[in-house]
């Protein structure tokens, strides 16, 4: 299709002289309008509620003034950006726009009606974008005279601060339209990624296991929310644990997204919603906004602490076994901090260490109880994954049912001697961080395998869209594809559920001895 002459020949981005329209004056629409105005565009903002539209414009101008006060903008720049904002009272007023971004209600019928109306008023070269986070771009564009000019332009909230933009192509979207939107998002200071229209796009799909596995562990009495959150923050390196994050998002919103993805994938068990979260929604315990979710947010409420193990004596005899992959850093930390520890080569049962009566290994997706029975190592204690064992201040341990109290105390004492605080969790397959990261990598691998996006764009999306400490594919490479394959295979064997089936991409890389980056 012909793309507006308002875009730059060199970059493909819309020139600052191009007029940008935004439909919807809520938080997201106002944020997108602010981003476009800051980039030099005249921005037309429309909302059915005229008072809300005027209030949003005043709020954006006030935000520009605050940025000037903080030295982030020159006063003249702030005034100029504010002057480029205008309210319009009808969709027909977008006639001269080069790009219109719709950020209205998340309803297919509403979006279709908006775009059908716009087609009657705008130039044939005007690009039509939707900020939807969940509705098929193909479905939104269906029935339009020119569906090839419709694409997703999905910002993350708050739009002025969050770097990521997902540029989403439906079946009819013209490649040059997506390229112009990618270039324009980059010109606006964002980091765009390209995706094809599938349920959840990239971020809302790949992030599902972060919530789902935590809820599964909680449902199996694996640990309290505060303990699971602490493991994911302090060992996993995530900014927020899954339960505090769900409380922040709102359980009504988070549960609805999970349900939507579950239905969209024809009830694939990977995306099965949690009964625990459904009960919170039924009770009205929606998180921060209602004052109660997994945690209480009442005045004076104190956040619960993780269930830390009490201090134990350091074990008398410690032997360390050589490691590769993520456990190599743990071996280094033990070597540096455990005086008198013996270097004992490698171990046939893949042990990390023996400490007093305890035998210690990194979880491989089996329960400690099953692994102890299979290897004949009764006093077995497993340690969970950490993003970087040299820096982590906390780790999770679990024990086999066969493990004696004395042996477990020796293991706890070893980790405490090495400077870790220790959270004890129940013996669930894959523990907490390892199963979560493996399932994130598995979902990411399937997303790439199905042609939704490139590996590089996927990792960038998860780092910039939801602040993951590392993209899940790069993380899988660091852990080792073979280890991730074993963890997933053992989870599948433990549960006997299709939910934990190994992605064909991971299986192929494992068979070939390859990585996502090789």
Please state what every model-predicted region is:
Residues 113-164, 169-183, 354-408:
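Rossmann-fold NAD(P)-binding glycine/threonine-rich loop
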Residues 29-30:
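N-terminal Rossmann-fold NAD(P) dinucleotide-binding loop
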Residues 2-7, 15, 41, 190-197, ...:
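NAD(P)-dependent Rossmann-like dehydrogenase/reductase catalytic/cofactor-binding core
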Residues 16-19, 97, 125, 315:
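Phosphate-coordination loops involved in phosphoryl transfer and adenosine-cofactor binding
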Residues 44:
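Conserved beta-strand positions in the Rossmann-like core of class I SAM-dependent methyltransferases
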Residues 36:
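Aromatic pocket-lining residues of Rossmann-like dinucleotide-binding sites
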Residues 48, 52, 66-128, 135, ...:
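Rossmann-like NAD(P)-binding element
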Residues 25-26:
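Glycine-rich Rossmann-fold phosphate-binding loop(s) that bind the pyrophosphate
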């Amino acid at each position: 299709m012909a793309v507006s002459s308002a875009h730059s020949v060199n970059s493909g981005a819309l020139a600052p002289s191009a007029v940008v329209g935004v439909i919807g004056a809520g938080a997201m629409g106002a944020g997108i309008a602010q981003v476009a105005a800051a980039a030099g565009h005249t921005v037309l903002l429309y909302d059915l509620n005229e008072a809300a539209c005027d209030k949003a414009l005043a709020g954006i101008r006030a935000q520009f003034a605050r940025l000037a006060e903080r030295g982030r903008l020159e006063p003249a720049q702030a005034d100029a950006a504010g002057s480029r904002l205008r309210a319009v009272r009808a969709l027909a007023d977008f006639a001269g726009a080069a790009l219109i971004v719709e950020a209205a209600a998340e309803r297919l019928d509403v979006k279709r009606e908006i775009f059908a109306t716009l087609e009657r008023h705008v130039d044939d070269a005007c690009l039509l974008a939707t900020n939807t986070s969940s509705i098929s771009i193909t479905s939104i564009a269906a029935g339009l005279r020119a569906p090839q000019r419709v694409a997703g332009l999905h910002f993350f909230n708050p739009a002025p601060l969050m770097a990521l933009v997902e540029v989403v192509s439906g079946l009819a979207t013209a490649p040059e339209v997506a390229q112009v939107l990618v270039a324009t998002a980059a010109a606006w200071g964002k980091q765009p990624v390209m995706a094809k229209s599938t349920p959840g796009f990239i971020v809302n799909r790949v992030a599902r296991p972060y919530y789902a596995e935590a809820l599964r562990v909680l449902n199996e009495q694996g640990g309290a929310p505060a303990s699971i959150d602490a493991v994911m923050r302090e060992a996993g390196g995530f900014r927020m644990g899954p339960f505090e994050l769900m409380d922040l998002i709102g359980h009504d919103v988070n549960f609805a997204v999970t349900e939507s993805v579950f239905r969209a994938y024809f009830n694939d068990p990977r995306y099965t919603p949690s009964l625990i979260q459904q009960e919170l929604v039924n009770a009205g315990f929606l998180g921060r906004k209602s004052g109660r979710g997994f945690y209480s947010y009442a005045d004076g409420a104190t956040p619960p602490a993780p269930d830390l193990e009490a201090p134990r004596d350091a074990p008398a005899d410690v032997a360390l076994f050589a490691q590769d992959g993520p456990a190599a850093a743990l071996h280094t930390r033990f070597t540096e901090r455990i005086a008198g520890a013996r270097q004992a080569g490698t171990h046939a049962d893949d042990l990390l260490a023996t400490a007093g009566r305890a035998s210690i290994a990194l979880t491989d997706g089996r329960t400690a109880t099953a692994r102890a029975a299979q290897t004949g190592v009764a006093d077995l204690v497993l340690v969970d994954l950490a993003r970087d064992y040299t820096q982590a201040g906390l780790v999770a341990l679990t024990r086999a049912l066969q493990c004696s109290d004395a042996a477990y105390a020796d293991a706890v004492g070893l980790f405490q001697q090495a400077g870790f605080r220790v959270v004890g969790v129940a013996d669930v397959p894959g523990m907490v961080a390892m199963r979560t990261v493996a399932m994130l990598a598995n979902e990411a691998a399937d997303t790439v395998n199905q042609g939704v996006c490139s590996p590089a764009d996927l990792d960038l999306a998860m780092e910039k869209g939801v602040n993951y400490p590392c993209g899940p594919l790069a993380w899988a490479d660091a852990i080792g594809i073979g280890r991730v394959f074993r963890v997933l295979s053992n989870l599948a064997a433990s549960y006997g559920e299709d939910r934990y089936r190994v992605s064909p991409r991971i299986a192929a890389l494992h068979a070939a001895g390859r990585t996502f980056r090789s």
